[in-house]
Amino acid sequence: MTISDVPTQTLPAEGEIGLIDVGSLQLESGAVIDDVCIAVQRWGKLSPARDNVVVVLHALTGDSHITGPAGPGHPTPGWWDGVAGPSAPIDTTRWCAVATNVLGGCRGSTGPSSLARDGKPWGSRFPLISIRDQVQADVAALAALGITEVAAVVGGSMGGARALEWVVGYPDRVRAGLLLAVGARATADQIGTQTTQIAAIKADPDWQSGDYHETGRAPDAGLRLARRFAHLTYRGEIELDTRFANHNQGNEDPTAGGRYAVQSYLEHQGDKLLSRFDAGSYVILTEALNSHDVGRGRGGVSAALRACPVPVVVGGITSDRLYPLRLQQELADLLPGCAGLRVVESVYGHDGFLVETEAVGELIRQTLGLADREGACRR
């Protein structure tokens, strides 16, 4: 089934989750996933011309719930609260913010915990996917909604990788892009830390080769450990030392089996993830990050970026040790539609793109200004 074969569907009510059927998807690898469903939420009204959509793309463990309180279908508050709404950077009196849950995820979209055609969870049968596959699924979902061109795509981290694949792979479908805290390809450092996280999950006996969903046991210990390691790469070194130094946790004594304060903090982060995320999705999405390379099949990174005609804003975080500024500088130097790297000062590391909402909000406004100008040129 091609994108044009999918019957037109409708956006959900504002803030509610809608499930969009996109049919079968052939992946970059050649594998096929049948009966793909993509979860979406939206804020703001779709214009009569369907040309005011801003697609918001989440990071590894995010979902479609970018703003608002917890509720049915979304157990945590919005992960980018304040970014979309009346008078917000994505001003919903003018723009229609649409957020998807990524292919391979576990908050409504098809992933390892979803049921396959035989009525059993996909589990280990779920194929490896790429960032391009994720974007193909999003493009198909929007097409099913009758949206064939969007004003802008906005994302950080894995969402930034998706935004990059949008502007490079679908330049006729997007007028501007915001690429935050991301690079053109996965680095050795990223792959090293991420494959170690995957190894922690798979070393848990309850992983059961990925087919644990109907056994009553899940690789919770492995997922906790993976999240603890990942969270260290998300935060800034100075921030962590300022908050925790080498302090004990309360009255505990590490020399007598107690914990350090930072140790307790990381354990808490691991516990929080268990309540809302599937280990199989964590593995699948992390593998997608490992294989991220915008230059694959396009003549290399430089050729792929130089050929992109879409106006973009590229932003990086000063203290980001997972995606250091040199990676965003490369994007800014090679993308013809970029007017220079925008640097966000922050002590919060990679997570600065989530925390520094005022600075990031200004980058979003700049991106939408580019979308306006590009729209005028295309008319």
From Swiss-Prot:
Substrate binds at R227, D351. The active site is at S157 (nucleophile), D320, H350. Residues 52-356 form the AB hydrolase-1 domain. Gene3D superfamilies: alpha/beta hydrolase. Its main location: cytoplasm. InterPro entries: AB_hydrolase_1, AB_hydrolase_fold, HAT_MetX-like. Keywords: Acyltransferase, Amino-acid biosynthesis, Cytoplasm, Methionine biosynthesis, Transferase. It is an enzyme of class 2 (transferase). Pathway: Amino-acid biosynthesis; L-methionine biosynthesis via de novo pathway; O-acetyl-L-homoserine from L-homoserine: step 1/1. Pfam families: Abhydrolase_1 (PF00561). One of its GO terms (cellular component) is cytoplasm. Its EC number is 2.3.1.31. GO terms for molecular function: homoserine O-acetyltransferase activity. It catalyses: L-homoserine + acetyl-CoA = O-acetyl-L-homoserine + CoA. It is found in: Cytoplasm. One of its GO terms (biological process) is methionine biosynthetic process. Homodimer. Belongs to the AB hydrolase superfamily. MetX family. Transfers an acetyl group from acetyl-CoA to L-homoserine, forming acetyl-L-homoserine. This is Homoserine O-acetyltransferase. It comes from Mycobacterium tuberculosis (strain CDC 1551 / Oshkosh). The lineage of its organism: Bacteria, Bacillati, Actinomycetota, Actinomycetes, Mycobacteriales.
